[in-house]
Structures are given as structure tokens and as C-alpha cells.
Amino acid sequence: MTQPTEPIEFAVSADQITERFSGGSTLPSAVLETLRAICATSVENESLANHGRDWWPLAMHWALQGKTPRKPGAVCAPSTTDQVAALVAVCNTHDLPLTVAGGRSGVCGSAVPLYGGIVLDVTSLQGIVSVDEVSGIVEVLPGTFGPDFENELQSKYSLTVGHFPQSFDISTVGGWVACRGAGQYSTRYGKIEDMVVGLEVVLANGDVVRTGGAPASAIGPDLTSLFVGSEGTLGVITKVWLRAHPVAQFQARASYVFPSFIDGVNACRDSVRNGATPAVLRLYDQTESQRSHGLDGTQCTLLVLDEGDERLVKATLDIVRESAIQNRGTVGDVELVEKWLHHRNDTSGLQALTRKGYIVDTMEVSAPWSKLESIFNGVRTAFMSAPGLSLIHI
């Protein structure tokens, strides 16, 4: 099974790694013994250092200086919901800070245990528990990595959830839910909150609750939505029920070139408003289109991919084509879609640039169609006021 991928090497051996934010992380021996009686618990230098970071760009630079942001006092790896509940109860009793971690693929430092305490590593909670093939609902454990999840779901059940974030190869189902992620196929399948049917969650006092489970409810607040996107602040997710779809039997692709970014935005908007929701509708700005697609630096590229029923896919691509042409688009190189599929999750460039001293960061914003042009221009101008390269896509 897949294990966490560390972002970059440390410049020193494990016993020489220091903390960027110090504060003391040693736990009392009695507490450690209690934790060890519950589940696998590590205080090894390498484990503490790795669980003190994620893919935060600044932390990658600190690693090359022999530093990790902040070490926990221990790393606990429960393999059952009961063990998670017992760990959380111990932290509650002893007033210990608790940070939940999975693949640690985030780029914002949110998996860093800033207050020490323990890191609860959910990656021992792996695998598909059950599949309701009639209803299209899959029960899966939170520490299951994207490739393991989709490979088993597709090969054994001919189903897919359709959630493919850029971090797919190195992130977990629990992380997708806790961080309310969006995948690269979200125009067709929705974001993760559209896929979650129910959750099992351990609360801060160790109690276990189950939310959702029914197709819909007309009574009371939606408790599931409270935990989706809560990033571990309200509880520890220990099981997830997700909607699944039959693996697509037909796929079609297209590419278009626009004289300006706003022309491409308008084409995307018109496509969606006319009922076309292709799995991938990905527009690149002039800089990224030149760098990745070989254009002249003034044009923008739109990549399109859809899958599913052949009739629906063809109709969808027809609507996108009409919208593109009506907004000054011309047909581009469809092979660019295949190139994107092959390289879309590659992180090797990030590590290589970091080793050369560059800061490589990412940010995302959401806005109504009416404000996209002003946001695009504002963000681009702000970034280009400093030396560097800015690449934008929607």
C-alpha cells in the first residue's frame, strides 16, 4: 500500500534535525506508556521530523537547512476507530495538543504540530471496507491513498469516485474530505462535498458519531457538512461513505486557442450555462500556454476532456466547441490533453527548483464569473511586481 511521500530530503541526519519553531516537545513517560498501550507509537527522530512538516514550500527550504517546522512529542498510528477514540480521550484528559495527519500533502503548513503534543497518523486506517454496487456507495477508511483507492474501486467493481486532485498520488481520502478538496474532474463529478454521503467521526472527548447515510434529509442541520472542510478541528474522521459512478466507457478530448484570457473565460462560462459540464475544462493564461504548450505568449489554451455515455459526451463537446468559436476561439492541438494527463501530478520540478533556491508556491481563489477578469488582472499584476514567474489557470 502507498505510504506518505516526503517532500524533500533533509540536509542532515535524523538526529541532527532541529526545529524552526521551538518550544519543547517531550511527553511525560507515563503518557507515552499509555499511548503505547493503545497503538503503535514512535518517538524516533526521523518519524518526529517528518511528521513535523508537510509540502509547505517554506518548510521544504528549511529541510535543506536541516530544520523541520516543529516536532511532535510522539507519532501515534491507530488502526481502528476504537484506538482513535482512546487516543483522543487520552489527549483530552491530559490536555495534550493533537494534530491529525494523513499523506501530509498540503502546501500551507496545516499539518505542522505547532504546539507539539502528538500527531495522530491515520495512514494505518487504509482500504475499502464495503461497496454498495446497487446504490453506488463506497465505504472507505481515511488513510487510503488516492491510487490505492481508485485502483481497487475500478479493478474490482468497475466504479470510480471521480475525485482527482493534483495531489492525488500522495494524498488520502480523509485529507480530501477534511480539506474540502476539488479534483481536476470536478466539473463532471463535483467537489468532494458533493460526493460525501456520510462520515464516522471521533469527537474531542473520544465519543464516536455517525453522520449522514441517507440519500437526503429534510429535517435539521446537515451535520456531515460541518466536518467536511473542518481540517481536524471538530473531530477525527475515521470512515467515509462516498458516491461512486460506473467507469466511463467513452471519452473525448478537445483543445482551443484564444487571443485573450477573458475570451477563454467567456467560452467556459457559456459552455456551463448552456448545460455542458465536461469533466475537464481547463484554461491557461498566456504565460503558461507559452511555457507548456508552445504558443507565442499572447494566446491562451483551453483543454477539454469528457467521459461517460457517448451521446452525452458528444453533445457536451459540441456545446463547448460552439461556445469556443463564438468567443474567438480556434481549434488547438488535442494532443496537449494527453500531455497534460501524463504530467499533471508530477512534482519533480518543484523539488528541483527548491534545491536551486527558488520559492515555488500556489494559491487558489473562487469568484463569480463577473469578477474573474479583474481578479485575474489584479493577481497577475501583483505577482509580477516581484521577480519571478506567475502561471494562472482556471
Regions found by a protein language model. Name each.
Residues 1-89, 106-136, 286-293, 336-362, ...:
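N-terminal flexible segment immediately upstream of the FAD-binding catalytic core
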Residues 36, 92, 154-155, 272, ...:
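Anion (oxyanion) recognition and catalysis
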Residues 45-61, 246, 252-392:
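C-terminal substrate-recognition/cap domain of FAD-linked oxidoreductases
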Residues 94, 156-157, 327, 386:
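Helix C-cap/helix->beta junction micro-motif
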Residues 102-105, 166, 283-286:
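Short, ordered loop/turn segments at secondary-structure junctions
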Residues 127-282:
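FAD-binding subdomain of flavoenzyme oxidoreductases
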